[in-house]
C-alpha cells in the first residue's frame, strides 16, 4: 500500500519530510475548461528514502461547466508530464454531473494507456473503464471492517480502491437518531479532553476512540481518531490489498511524527 499526504503548496516543504508521496491540491478548473494552478514548488527530499512520484489533485469546487473536456484532459496530462506526476486524483463534488463524467471518462482512458493512477469519487466510478475509487474511512456506525469489505466487493477488490483516511472527530448528542454528529476541530476536542478528563475507550467495531459526557442535561458521545486508530485502519487496508491511502495534511500534521513513527 502506498501512502500519500494531500498538501497545499505552502505545506509541501514540511510534509515532504515524511515517508509518503505528495498529492498536490493545487489545481482547479477555470473558465473555458482551462487548468488553473497555484504557485507550486516541489522540494527535493533528502535522506535515504526515494520519494514516490507525486499526484495531481484536481478540484471542481465552484468551477464552471467543462465544455471542452479534451482540452482540459490534455492540459492535465501535460502538467503531469512536466512535473513527473504518477497519477491524478479528481476531487469532485457529489452528486456527479454529466460534464464532469464525460471529462472523467476521457481522462481515464488516457491514464489507462499511460498506466497512471486515476482516482475517482464513488459517484464517478462508472465514468471510467478501470477506475480506482476513493473510499472514505470515517464511519460512525456499524462495523468498519464489514463496511470496507463491502466497498471492496462493490469495486472489484482492493487493487481498485484507495482509502481517504479522514480523521474522525465528531460530537453526537444522544440519542443520535439521524446518525449525524457535529464535527469538532482538534482544538475543541483537546479542550473537551482537558476539561472532562474522561475515560477513553477503543471501539473494535468502528476502529476509533470514544468517550461520553453530560452537559446541560444532554448526553454526548464523542468519536475520534488518533494516530493509533488511523494505523489500525491502514493495517486492515494492507491486509485486504487496498492500493493506496491518502491523509489530508492539515488533519494529521499534529500527529504526523507518531503516525509515521518518525525518529
Predicted regions and their residues:
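Glycan-binding loop/region signatures in secreted carbohydrate-active enzymes
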Residues: 160, 165-233
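Short acidic, glycine/proline-enriched helix-loop-strand junctions
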Residues: 98-101, 107-116, 201-210, 254-263
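A structural signal for short, well-ordered beta-strand segments and their strand-loop junctions
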Residues: 89-91, 117-122, 160-166, 246-248
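A structural signal for the main folded, soluble domain(s) of proteins
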Residues: 33-36, 41, 63, 70-74, ...
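Acidic/aromatic/glycine-rich contiguous surface patches that form carbohydrate-binding/processing clefts
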Residues: 233-263
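A generic secondary-structure signal
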Residues: 75-82, 109, 150-154, 232-240
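Chitinase-like catalytic core of GlcNAc-active glycosidases
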Residues: 1-141
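Active-site region of glycoside hydrolase catalytic domains
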Residues: 101-102, 116-117, 128-132, 149-175
Amino acid at each position: 500500500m502506498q501512502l500519500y499526504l494531500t498538501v497545499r503548496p505552502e505545506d509541501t516543504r514540511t510534509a515532504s519530510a515524511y515517508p509518503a508521496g505528495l498529492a498536490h491540491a493545487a489545481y482547479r478548473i477555470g473558465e473555458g475548461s482551462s487548468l488553473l494552478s497555484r504557485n507550486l514548488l516541489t522540494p527535493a527530499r533528502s535522506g535515504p528514502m526515494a520519494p514516490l512520484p507525486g499526484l495531481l489533485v484536481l478540484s471542481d469546487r465552484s468551477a464552471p461547466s467543462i465544455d471542452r473536456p479534451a482540452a482540459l484532459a490534455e492540459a492535465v496530462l501535460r502538467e503531469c508530464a512536466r512535473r513527473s506526476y504518477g497519477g491524478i486524483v479528481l476531487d469532485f463534488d457529489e452528486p456527479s454531473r454529466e460534464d464532469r463524467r464525460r471529462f472523467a471518462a476521457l481522462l481515464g482512458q488516457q491514464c489507462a494507456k499511460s498506466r497512471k493512477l486515476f482516482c475517482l469519487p464513488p459517484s464517478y466510478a462508472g465514468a471510467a473503464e478501470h477506475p480506482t475509487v476513493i473510499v472514505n474511512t470515517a464511519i460512525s456506525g456499524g462495523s468498519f471492517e464489514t463496511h470496507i469489505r463491502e466497498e471492496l466487493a462493490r469495486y472489484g477488490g482492493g487493487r481498485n480502491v484507495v482509502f481517504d483516511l479522514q480523521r474522525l472527530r465528531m460530537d453526537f448528542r444522544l440519542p443520535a437518531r439521524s446518525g449525524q454528529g457535529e464535527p469538532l476541530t482538534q482544538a475543541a476536542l483537546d479542550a473537551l479532553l482537558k476539561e472532562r478528563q474522561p475515560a477513553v475507550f477503543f471501539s473494535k467495531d468502528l476502529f476509533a476512540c470514544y468517550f461520553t459526557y453530560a452537559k446541560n442535561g444532554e448526553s454526548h458521545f464523542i468519536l475520534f481518531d488518533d494516530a493509533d486508530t488511523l494505523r489500525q485502519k491502514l493495517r486492515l487496508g494492507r491486509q485486504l490489498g487496498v492500493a493506496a491511502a491518502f491523509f489530508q495534511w492539515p488533519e494529521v500534521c499534529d500527529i504526523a511524527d507518531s503516525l509515521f513513527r518518525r525518529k
